[in-house]
């Protein structure tokens, strides 16, 4: 299941906790996305998990059986043809991790909504994730009706009808529903066929400035590494425009918080691209699509533990402005997304909101709210262009709940 082709599209795997998203990634890519030790303990994806999968086609077989992820077709004893490599973003389904899901949605070109046939539709996070796709405007969607091997035909049919009813009037209306069993790897060919037709590779402009949304950052050095062997910090995320080459100089904004003369301010960080990893291989150049790792000259102490997640990277001087306060046009949902689903009240001055812009999540305090706009002072600044979409979450009880979408003025 290996491939040296760069991924060209990012596909989100979204849906309720334990509905089988991570198992599905494993069936498609042979990789398990839960790499985080805490995730192994809790059995849920906490940070975004990434895995690449290469879709292939057997030249001798009829469709849809021809679609596969295997390099060799045993039935016809021939090597399969490469179609394209895609990156899967496995977004957490646990409700307290909604912010992570939203920041992941910023780099998705399409999504597979995984819904288990063993439970009534919709479950709370299924609804929440679909609202997030709606808000961010992701409408290339395929629905995987998973675990059909665990129910009888009548129950599977009831579940299918519930799914159709649930997606009516949303971005997923009309999306194909593919019955699968990720655990048994059944109907994976049908799922690949649906993804190939519903989630095309977007057209990209290679001549624009490189722009990378940083979703993760790491220190890859093992404890006890000697000074001579120390590797620079690594950024993980997605290139959304232009192309990036090894040895390019890049700037990260908003950068780092620096204390000078008793005052703290945010300063951009500049570094050199030391290495590029895409599709599991080291490459000299990356273009948009897929998820990439960028080895840098940064001190690993400032990249460890996702400390630079939410930054934007690109050639120095080319990035959008950094905002410590901003005004946004607000479009509220009618009801709070989640299991209790009360009505959404207007935003009021002084209330705290959790805002997700691109891959950045920050808390802001509303300094002024009137009609369909509000001004917000941010705890952590964000780098974002005018017109950027903002997912707005409000504290309801002990949790942050999605209540609407903002557009940056």
Curated annotation (Swiss-Prot):
GTP-binding in keyword set: yes
Amino-acid positions noted as binding Mg(2+) 1 in the UniProt annotation, renumbered to this chain: 22, 45
Gene3D superfamilies the UniProt entry points to: P-loop containing nucleotide triphosphate hydrolases (3.40.50.300), Translation factors (2.40.30.10)
Domain (tr-type G) ranges: 6-203
Positions of the UniProt region annotated as G4: 146-149
Range of residues in the leader sequence: none
Binding-site list for Mg(2+) 2: 18, 43
Region (G3): 90-93
Cofactors required: Mg(2+)
One CC-aspect GO term: cytosol
Residues holding GTP: 18-23, 146-149, 181-183
Start and end residues of each stretch annotated as G5: 181-183
GO terms under biological process: formation of translation preinitiation complex
Region annotation (G2) ranges: 43-47
Family: Belongs to the TRAFAC class translation factor GTPase superfamily. Classic translation factor GTPase family. EIF2G subfamily.
Assembly description: Heterotrimer composed of an alpha, a beta and a gamma chain.
Protein name, as recorded: Translation initiation factor 2 subunit gamma
Species annotation: Haloarcula marismortui (strain ATCC 43049 / DSM 3752 / JCM 8966 / VKM B-1809) (Halobacterium marismortui)
């Amino acid at each position: 299941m290996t491939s040296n082709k760069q991924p060209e599209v990012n596909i989100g795997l979204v849906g309720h906790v334990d509905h089988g998203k991570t198992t599905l990634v494993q069936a498609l890519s042979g990789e398990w996305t839960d790499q985080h030790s805490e995730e192994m303990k809790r059995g849920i994806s906490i940070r975004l998990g990434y895995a690449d999968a290469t879709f292939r086609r057997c030249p001798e077989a009829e469709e849809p059986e021809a679609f596969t992820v295997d390099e060799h077709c045993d039935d016809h004893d021939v090597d399969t043809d490469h179609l394209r490599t895609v990156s899967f973003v496995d977004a957490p389904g646990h409700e307290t991790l909604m912010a992570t899901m939203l920041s992941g949605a910023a780099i998705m070109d399409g999504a597979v909504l995984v819904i288990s046939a063993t439970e009534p539709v919709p479950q709370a996070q299924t609804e929440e994730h679909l609202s997030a796709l709606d808000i961010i405007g992701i409408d290339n969607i395929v629905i995987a009706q998973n675990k059909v091997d665990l129910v009888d035909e009548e129950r599977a049919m009831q579940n299918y009808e519930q799914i159709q009813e649930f997606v009516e009037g949303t971005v997923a209306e009309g999306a194909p529903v593919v019955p699968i069993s990720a655990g048994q790897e059944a109907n994976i060919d049908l799922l690949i066929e649906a993804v190939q037709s519903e989630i095309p590779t977007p057209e990209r402009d290679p001549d624009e400035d490189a722009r990378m949304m940083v979703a993760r950052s790491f220190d890859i050095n093992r404890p006890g590494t000697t000074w001579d062997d120390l590797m620079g910090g690594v950024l993980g995320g997605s290139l959304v425009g232009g192309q990036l080459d090894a040895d390019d100089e890049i700037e990260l904004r908003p950068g780092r918080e620096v204390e000078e003369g008793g005052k703290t301010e945010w300063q951009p960080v500049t570094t050199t691209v030391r290495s590029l990893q895409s599709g599991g291989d080291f490459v000299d150049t990356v273009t948009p699509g897929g998820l990439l790792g960028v080895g840098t000259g940064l001190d690993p102490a400032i990249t460890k533990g996702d400390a630079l997640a939410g930054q934007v990277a690109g050639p120095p001087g080319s990035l959008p402005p950094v905002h410590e306060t901003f005004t946004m046009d607000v479009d509220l949902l009618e009801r709070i997304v989640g299991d209790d689903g009360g009505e959404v009240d207007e935003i009021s001055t002084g209330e705290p909101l959790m805002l997700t812009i691109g891959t950045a999540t920050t808390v802001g305090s509303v300094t002024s709210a009137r009609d369909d706009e509000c001004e917000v002072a941010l705890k952590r600044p964000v780098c974002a262009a005018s017109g950027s979409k903002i997912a707005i979450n409000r504290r309801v009880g002990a949790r942050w709940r999605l209540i609407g979408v903002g557009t940056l003025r």
